[in-house]
Amino acid sequence: MAPLQPGDSFPANVVFSYIPPTGSLDLTVCGRPIEYNASEALAKGTSVLVAVPGAFTPTCQEKHVTGFIAKLDQLRQAGVDRVLFIASNDAFVMSAWGKANGIKDESILFLSDSDTAFSSSIGWANAGRTGRYAIVVKDGKVVYAAVDTVRGSTEKSGVDAVLTVLGNQGKL
């Protein structure tokens, strides 16, 4: 499959591994991974799927996830129903990353694309890891898809780029 473009349907059968929040920020409290059917979830409403190369890594932590957390209210005001972060880390690491960032509910989902199946399928995996990209989906249709190819850059996939797209398209 080629990279996603605005106007494309979000692919069918995209499933990630996910540990639902327990309400606790205790990193030693482990949930059990379940499947998260992204194709089904993204079929309704407005969603932002953000991929990062790795949880707890400098750019991913310092620029990417913290930006989306800080501007979550602005995303909601722009009509975003859900924010999903994916990385090639396993579901346990992704769950811990969410907790380490103070997320104890489903305001932002931390999902695992551990074998990079999805990222590879759209050509945005890099050396066994997920690439750094953002995809905005409204009612199952891609309205924005962009990948950052410059190391450390979040110019195309960061929260400000996403908010600009949402603002330029009205409230989608």
From Swiss-Prot:
A biological-process GO annotation: cellular response to oxidative stress
Catalytic activity from the UniProt record: a hydroperoxide + [thioredoxin]-dithiol = an alcohol + [thioredoxin]-disulfide + H2O
Keywords: Antioxidant, Cytoplasm, Disulfide bond, Isopeptide bond, Metal-binding, Oxidoreductase, Peroxidase, Redox-active center, Ubl conjugation, Zinc
E.C. code: 1.11.1.24
Every Thioredoxin domain range: 4-171
Main subcellular localisation: cytoplasm
Active site: C60
MF term (GO), any: thioredoxin peroxidase activity
Oligomer status and interactors: Homodimer; disulfide-linked, upon oxidation.
Note from the entry: The active site is a conserved redox-active cysteine residue, the peroxidatic cysteine (C(P)), which makes the nucleophilic attack on the peroxide substrate. The peroxide oxidizes the C(P)-SH to cysteine sulfenic acid (C(P)-SOH), which then reacts with another cysteine residue, the resolving cysteine (C(R)), to form a disulfide bridge. The disulfide is subsequently reduced by an appropriate electron donor to complete the catalytic cycle. In this typical 2-Cys Prx, C(R) is provided by the other dimeric subunit to form an intersubunit disulfide.
Protein task: Thiol-specific peroxidase that catalyzes the reduction of hydrogen peroxide and organic hydroperoxides to water and alcohols, respectively. Plays a role in cell protection against oxidative stress by detoxifying peroxides and as sensor of hydrogen peroxide-mediated signaling events. Preferentially eliminates organic peroxides rather than hydrogen peroxide. Relays alkyl hydroperoxides as a signal to the transcription factor CAD1/YAP2 by inducing the formation of intramolecular disulfide bonds in CAD1, which causes its nuclear accumulation and activation. Involved in cellular Mn(2+) homeostasis.
Protein name: Peroxiredoxin AHP1
Organism: Chaetomium thermophilum (strain DSM 1495 / CBS 144.50 / IMI 039719) (Thermochaetoides thermophila)
Lineage: Eukaryota, Fungi, Dikarya, Ascomycota, Pezizomycotina
